[in-house]
């Protein structure tokens, strides 16, 4: 199975005034977006939208255990329009200079059901599920690709581990006969320990191992933005280090309505339903977080203020995936902001030191939304040793309307999810500079799908 680009992010470029009626496009005092223009309705829109071709809940941010700083991402996504779900989970341990990550695909009908993987009924408790916490087979990792295997006569068998019914298929390089990947089409059930993976065929040398990873999100009916229980496990792709998150998350204040309205129209309305033609987006940017992170058996009690995105609707195609650059900031003065630059139309990949126009959505401490133009400058290029993609580790963001200059700096260089296609950079960053003419600082995030 060829892994498709796993993209999430700030949708599509369009003229600022057209996208957000009432948005300020000058350097005069920015005008707030009227609250009545928002199409987001909570708690209903916190739930699954079963007709949406794409949907995800994405938790990121900075957590601390005393002086020890961690960046994390827990992303559960459904691309039912392309026939799969996926998770991306990562942890950056800044002091140890370590980054743990894994991307996992889930295929229907046994791996995930796009109609039931999350709760759609607003009269029930909210939940999201990818993977099974109680069965230790979620994916299969090729540890040695071997050579000489026949694409039509190679089988994968799952044995032991106390479970049954697992089914897996190999993807074989037709030229070399190497096992490129193994797709687990049915994870089976009841695997209380990692099962053995056996590859048979006329080739030789290929080996693989079982991987356990999962995401669960739960909250009580009524206001599911409160006391969200997010539990997740990743088995690091490079080292097999196990990382477990057990977090409780509660939003304080109003949601962050992206674009001020929460929606942008992508395709002609007559070409499908509103979920098939529009992109819907809101965030929770003042999330009080507490819980534990366990790294290879070592437990850290953590707290912090984190960020959640919920996006659903139309989001590109496999043939024309969206590419973008994004920075998020949660400032100590109570403001939150998200800047994005979409690589589409006349927007090309910026060169180091080249200022480019961008669009910034901001929220003040009282919850009022603003959308203004900005200028973004990328610096400090870094080449991923895994994918060969060149990312930027520093960004300067100038927001004239708010007399602001913010500098985002990645706290660790290597924070990539490397993939055969569609690698993406997701990383903890600092955010420092000035805002409304006064010194400002806070936690930051850098995202790059290039």
Language-model features: locations:
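Structured soluble/peripheral alpha/beta segments that form catalytic or ligand/cofactor-binding pockets
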Residues: 6-7, 11-133, 211-450
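Conserved, function-critical positions that sit in or immediately flank catalytic
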Residues: 134-212
